[in-house]
């Protein structure tokens, strides 16, 4: 699930910017408002190449922002620096430039319900459709603050229905849309289907983290091999 920022599909259908979009049964569906329940919220760091249109780096996912986030480049948090580290660097330092491009993502695993439409206007009713959604940049704080508010009030978050709309915002000449979550009713309990889906989402996160760690360790092994090779050359030079 994401917020649409284009007014036209590849097929030429005109759409409203700021609607939510989901992929379901081989086509996109759209709606200005949806209802979700949040089963799991994880955090991850990512670095994206806008020119190439593909990710450069992803970190493991964790349930809090504490500790190390091993990443696919063999580092931590895809190169995002803490404030103390960043303050020591000049503005044109490549490490600082990279750090500013790294994004912190809230990854929401849950279910979506509501009346949506295909691009041609055909209505589709969805009930508890499993979704994964990434909230970052301008979408990060609205969701983070909302979830924190639920937690502060000791809400059992997977039971809470969240009404999601969007709001138009502007920064300079750039117009964009941010999520506007509000609390709906709370269910009295989770269904067996909910519990099965939560386990599946946990398995998905675990599998993703295994993949990240494999790439992380491959990079580290490659670096060690390069260092060993350099040391071997230095040793050979010293005895000849």
Identify the residue ranges that each predicted region occupies.
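Glycine- and charge-rich intrinsically disordered segments
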Residues: 1-15, 192-240
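Weak global preference for isoleucine
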Residues: 3, 36-40, 56, 108, ...
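OB-fold ssDNA-binding interfaces and closely related basic DNA-contact patches used
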Residues: 4-124, 171-172, 176, 186-188, ...
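Extended serine/threonine-enriched, polar tracts that run as long, contiguous segments within proteins
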Residues: 103-187
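Detector for methionine-enriched segments
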Residues: 1, 44, 116, 141-143, ...
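Detector for Asparagine
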Residues: 26, 58, 70, 105, ...
């Amino acid at each position: 699930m994401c917020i649409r920022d284009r007014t036209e599909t590849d097929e030429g259908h005109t759409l409203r910017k700021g609607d939510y979009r989901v992929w379901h049964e081989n086509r996109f569906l759209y709606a200005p408002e949806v209802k979700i329940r949040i089963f799991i919220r994880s955090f991850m760091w990512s670095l994206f190449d806008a020119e190439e249109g593909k990710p450069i780096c992803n970190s493991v996912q964790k349930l809090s922002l504490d500790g190390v986030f091993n990443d696919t480049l063999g580092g931590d948090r895809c190169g995002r620096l803490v404030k103390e580290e960043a303050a020591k660097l000049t503005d044109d330092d490549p490490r600082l430039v990279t750090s500013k491009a790294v994004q912190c993502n809230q990854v929401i695993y849950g279910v979506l319900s509501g009346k949506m439409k295909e691009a041609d206007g055909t209505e589709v009713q969805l009930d508890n459709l499993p979704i994964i959604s990434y909230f970052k940049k301008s979408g990060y704080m609205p969701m983070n603050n909302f979830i924190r508010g639920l937690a502060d009030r000791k809400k059992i978050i997977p039971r809470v229905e969240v009404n999601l709309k969007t709001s138009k915002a502007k920064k300079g000449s750039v117009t964009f849309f941010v999520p506007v979550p509000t609390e709906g009713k709370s269910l009295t309990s989770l269904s067996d289907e909910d519990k099965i889906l939560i386990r599946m989402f946990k398995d998905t996160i675990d599998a993703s983290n295994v993949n990240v760690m494999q790439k992380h360790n491959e990079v580290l092994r490659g670096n060690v091999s390069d260092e060993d090779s350099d040391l071997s050359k230095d040793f050979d030079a010293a005895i000849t």
